[in-house]
UniProtKB/Swiss-Prot annotation:
It is found in: Host cytoplasm, Host perinuclear region. This is Protein AV2. It comes from Indian cassava mosaic virus (ICMV). One of its GO terms (cellular component) is host cell perinuclear region of cytoplasm. GO terms for biological process: negative regulation of gene silencing by regulatory ncRNA; symbiont-mediated suppression of host innate immune response. The keyword tRNA processing does not apply. The lineage of its organism: Viruses, Monodnaviria, Shotokuvirae, Cressdnaviricota, Repensiviricetes.
Length: 112
């Protein structure tokens, strides 16, 4: 967790609350598998908290809230069935690591 003797203290009370919220969400995030809806919703909350201005944060929160309201509590721990196009998701890192490195890919060379 955050150690106030080793790290700088936030300049405002709002910054302090955001820092505590991020630390709490990091602990909650560990309880969800990376391929679940709950994990995605927690990642969305990170983006809401870390938004730089009010308009951006409000927009992100409305998107988060509509996704949360459209799902039941039992769906939060179930794997997401729709594919995501993001190359940075933990779900995609798993598939990249599954590829064996010693396999060379064939190239088609035309005869001259």
């Amino acid at each position: 967790m955050w150690d106030p003797l080793l790290n700088e203290f936030p300049e405002s009370v709002h910054g302090f609350r955001c820092m505590l919220a991020v630390k709490y969400l990091q602990l909650v995030e560990c309880t969800y598998s990376p391929d679940t809806l709950g994990y995605d919703l927690i990642r969305d909350l990170f983006s809401v908290i870390r938004a730089k201005n009010y308009v951006e944060a409000t927009s992100r929160y409305h998107n988060f809230y509509s996704r949360l309201e459209g799902s039941s509590p039992s769906e939060l721990r179930q794997p997401i069935q729709q594919p995501c196009g993001c190359p940075y998701c933990p779900r995609h890192k798993k598939t990249i690591l599954d590829k064996q490195t010693h396999q060379s890919e064939a190239q088609v060379v035309s005869d001259v």
